[in-house]
């Protein structure tokens, strides 16, 4: 029988955004970044109240279809807990639909909030599993949960009926690595950008990416001088160039100048990983072209604070 949680209990969750793929690690590699959404969740007498401030304000639903709300309910169900009502207040700083893990952060925030409300019965692995289920892949969600860099993977059910299993392990990131995001002023649909990918790839391209993922893991942990080589990719970015021409242009421009630039997630954000700042000239040119420049650091894991018992 589900446990009824007390009215007045309140938690605050701070969740980092993330960059997925990191070039070759399609649906596998992720990196938590220092741009954060904060979600306040309180148990109330009845009903549902949702407020959104910042990114997505006036654009996202304010009812039970809001992703944070759906994730809270998923977390509560798994924790075998019930609430009479919820007040959810979202303070969003992660640009939405830009390839910076905003939807994964929302899912992580919801599941983490439910875990805090219920007294933390869920393991870290369960939080990754539940949040990743909303995405269909674990790279962004795992990065937001674990912080730092992650290697993640999916095991599909053999019976075709049960849910996929999502798993991840964290990597210690070299302390000198920083990130610079160039964010275009338009959205990218993850579904649309995925549709352009081929169902099959050549063995030589698969072999190329396997080697670059291995290089990227070493680059992130020990050898940041290998970041340029480690961000090379043949599985997804070449196919997405036609639907994201602005992104492709900037990725190529930066890479031609020696920067480890890649398409962040499904885009359209261009991400640069480096140990030195990107040149002021390039950043000024990006701003003049209408791109928002965000200087970022590698982020710590999601934080859950119980405000009121």
UniProtKB/Swiss-Prot annotation:
**Positions annotated to bind ATP:** 95-105
EC supergroup of this enzyme:
transferase
Q: Does the keyword Transmembrane apply?
A: no
Q: Which family does it belong to?
A: Belongs to the GHMP kinase family. Homoserine kinase subfamily.
PANTHER family per record: HOMOSERINE KINASE, HOMOSERINE/4-DIPHOSPHOCYTIDYL-2-C-METHYL-D-ERYTHRITOL KINASE
NCBIfam families registered for this protein in UniProt: thrB
**SUPFAM superfamilies attached to this UniProt entry:** GHMP Kinase, C-terminal domain, Ribosomal protein S5 domain 2-like
Query: According to its UniProt record, which reaction does this protein catalyse?
Result: L-homoserine + ATP = O-phospho-L-homoserine + ADP + H(+)
Cellular component GO terms held in the UniProt record: cytoplasm
What domain of life does the UniProt record list for this protein's source? Bacteria
Give the function comment from the record. Answer: Catalyzes the ATP-dependent phosphorylation of L-homoserine to L-homoserine phosphate.
- The protein in question is named Homoserine kinase
Q: Give one Pfam hit by family name.
A: GHMP_kinases_C
Q: Pathway of this protein?
A: Amino-acid biosynthesis; L-threonine biosynthesis; L-threonine from L-aspartate: step 4/5
Task: Supply one GO molecular-function term.
Answer: homoserine kinase activity
Record keyword Cytoplasm present? yes
Gene Ontology BP terms: threonine biosynthetic process
Keyword line:
Amino-acid biosynthesis, ATP-binding, Cytoplasm, Kinase, Nucleotide-binding, Threonine biosynthesis, Transferase
EC number in record: 2.7.1.39
User: What subcellular locations does the record give?
Assistant: Cytoplasm
